[in-house]
Amino acid sequence: ASEDGGRGPYVQADLAYAYEHITHDYPEPTAPNKNKISTVSDYFRNIRTRSVHPRVSVGYDFGGWRIAADYARYRKWNNNKYSVSIKELLRNKGNGNRTDLKAENQENGTFHAVSSLGLSAVYDFKLNDKFKPYIGARVAYGHVRHSIDSTKKTTEVTTILHGPGTTPTVYPGKNTQDAHRESDSIRRVGLGAVAGVGIDITPNLTLDAGYRYHYWGRLENTRFKTHEASLGVRYRF
């Protein structure tokens, strides 16, 4: 151990593996038909994704308590989905002619935790000269962008049969199109918790294996939380 009892400013660099859970609340269909499917599918309402990102911190070690400011940027998530469903509306039992409802849904969505600027207070438990488990709390100012472009087109299709071995005639009928487009750039303050263990390699250099949970706050119609496992090094001056 150093003569100052482990006190002093420090810098830390981490590589974090993040599990991100994004939940969207989009408007429900306004049509009186309760069986109508919303233009935004469940796939884009409840997103689970994983990413790897770097994180840097600067702080001060008081010899038991530590305070640190950290900054991180996350990978942008984007995806698209196309789906088709056909529902039979009417069938003539005599000749087999029928009318179907064809629904096509095209969705494009993005989500990006642009940045997170946090402040943590951490307490180190000194088990011996090498190992120091820790726990702490974190408050962070986060910036998030997300967008959705969802279009649903429904078409009534009538199929006329002409007899065995012949090609049926298909008549597209009336169609409707509904769309939902949304793009937001939101900044909020959220809360979280940190835990881990520090392993002193030298009096000034520490290997840090950590976990952190963060709830980014209510982002308009979006709830966002992250679980992160990280490995890094901390150098105290």
Curated annotation (Swiss-Prot):
Q: Which UniProt keywords apply?
A: Cell outer membrane, Membrane, Signal, Transmembrane, Transmembrane beta strand
Q: Where the protein is mainly located, per its record?
A: membrane
State whether keyword Transmembrane helix applies.
no
Q: Where is the signal peptide?
A: 1
Asked whether the UniProt record includes Magnesium among its keywords, one would answer: no
Q: Domain of life, per the record? A: Bacteria
Note the Gene3D superfamilies from the entry: 2.40.160.20
Q: Which GO terms describe its molecular function?
A: porin activity
Provide a GO CC annotation, any one.
cell outer membrane
What SUPFAM superfamilies does the database record attribute to this sequence?
OMPA-like
What does the UniProt entry say about where the protein is found? Answer: Cell outer membrane
Q: Which residues form a coiled coil?
A: none
Q: Which family does it belong to?
A: Belongs to the opacity porin family.
Q: What does this protein do?
A: Implicated in a number of adherence functions. OPA proteins are implicated in pathogenesis and are subject to phase variation.
Protein name, UniProt field: Opacity protein opA57
